[in-house]
């Protein structure tokens, strides 16, 4: 088994006070994600950053009703400082909910011979769930770190965790 840690959308616009699309619990799970990153690095596992990245006026904003967020080149599109990628950590941009759709994520993982993904970040019921679903459809084993993901509300967060486990066959895990 070769596992990689995915850090999904831990960007200023989702985490910081006043962020364009702030996720209420994202700052609360930040310390756990910092621990997960340190643990993965200690074990020699790849840490891959999966980051929402939009252009100004991206159709997603009007089509989905989201405010402009994670616009390339803006402070809101940056990974929060306490999780800054290391020099060898891949940063994969995505333009929609799934980290796989239209991105190089699958290639990055296959190059590193990864077969298991440990997911952290936000939003549990959106980008984390869609990335988990696409990972499962591609044959990856999926683990979601329950206390290192944040949803927009607790009900949706819990629903998404159940979907990962009951529908996708993934594992909901805690600290190692």
Name these PLM-found stretches:
Residues 4-11:
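Acidic-leg catalytic submotif of subtilisin-like serine proteases
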Residues 8, 51, 146:
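Active-site flanking residues adjacent to catalytic metal/cofactor-binding acidic residues
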Residues 58-63:
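Metal-dependent catalytic neighborhoods of phosphoester/phosphodiester hydrolases
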Residues 45-52:
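Short beta-strand segments at enzyme active-site cores
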């Amino acid at each position: 088994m070769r596992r990689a840690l995915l850090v999904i959308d831990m960007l200023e616009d989702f985490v910081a006070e006043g962020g364009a699309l702030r996720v209420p619990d994202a700052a609360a799970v930040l310390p756990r994600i910092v621990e997960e990153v340190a643990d993965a690095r200690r074990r020699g596992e790849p840490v891959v950053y999966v980051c929402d990245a939009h252009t100004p006026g991206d159709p997603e904003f009007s089509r989905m009703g989201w405010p402009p967020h994670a616009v390339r080149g803006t402070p809101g599109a940056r990974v929060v400082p306490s999780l800054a990628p290391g020099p060898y950590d891949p940063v994969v941009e995505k333009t929609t909910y799934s980290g796989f759709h239209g991105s190089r994520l699958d290639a990055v993982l296959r190059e590193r011979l990864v077969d298991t993904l440990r997911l952290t970040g936000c939003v549990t019921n959106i980008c984390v769930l869609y990335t988990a679903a696409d990972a499962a459809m591609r044959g990856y084993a999926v683990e979601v770190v329950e206390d290192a993901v944040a949803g927009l509300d607790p009900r949706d967060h819990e629903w998404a965790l159940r979907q990962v486990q009951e529908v996708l066959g993934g594992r909901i895990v805690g600290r190692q």
